[in-house]
Amino acid sequence: MSKFIRDIKENYLKMERELATQLNYDVTNHQLTAGSHREEVWIDFFRRIVPKKFNIARSVFIIDSNQNVSKEVDIAIYDEQYTPYIFNYGLIKFIPVEAVAAVVQCKSRNLNPEDLKEWADSIDVLKTSNDSIVRLATYIHIGKLQEEGSRNNAIQTATRPIKILCHIPVDETNTDDSKGRNKFDIVIEAYQNSKSDKNKDKNTSKEVSHEGNLKITFADKDLLEVLQKYNQADMKLNSKTIIKNSEKLKERKIGDYKVSDKTKKYTLLSFIFQFNQILMMINNPMFFPHKTYVDMFNNDIQEE
């Protein structure tokens, strides 16, 4: 193996250890301050791995044109260049669901299944709108007509954010221990105690490479699931659209993007490839439905 390839892989293992160390650092005995510190660490983590086309915001709310509002989102990953709309109320930010690629819930040691379910449900209730009009290269895209069947080649009919749970257990958790984790599409655990710690040679000063401190679980098994879940969230699946390449997408597993050798798993490096492949399956957000949001604001005025 080329030395620079080996060095890169080992560097990502060290980054895993550094991430866990920062998240577990006892900055204070004040819970809110500690939580704020950990959110900043997670924000920096995502900034390093997602493309620059995405912006990352902290402590925001996600809305749709039906006046639904999510619970507070610790971290939102959204496309501000493509859908440059953030509605503000003082310091509070409301981001339209059409722009949001992923939402992140950050937790520390303990997971409350009821709280996680309530939070996830507040994301799932949000619906994108197809009421958009856009000039494309060869035609005028009219979302409503497409919805009514004038164009039946649309792959992206309704998007929804990828739900990510980040938390920091002391030890690597058991896969069967749900505690609300099954409500999320991706679960990232930065556990404090690495199994390789127990195997280090205490009688030598030589640096020992470790297995890392991340465990990342995906709910989606293959790229076909990814395509359908995040681009066709309205469940109006058009078999004519996806049948041509559906078998190839189904064959390409999320697990195929893992980087590993006989003795080590490079979880962080793997996640960079896995997460960005999922983002590429979404690629661009929905065309923004300006008129639908205008109607939302106007209807509220009429109700007053």
Where are these regions (language model features)?
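Intrinsically disordered, low-complexity Ser/Thr/Pro/Gly-rich regulatory segments
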Residues: 1-72, 77-304
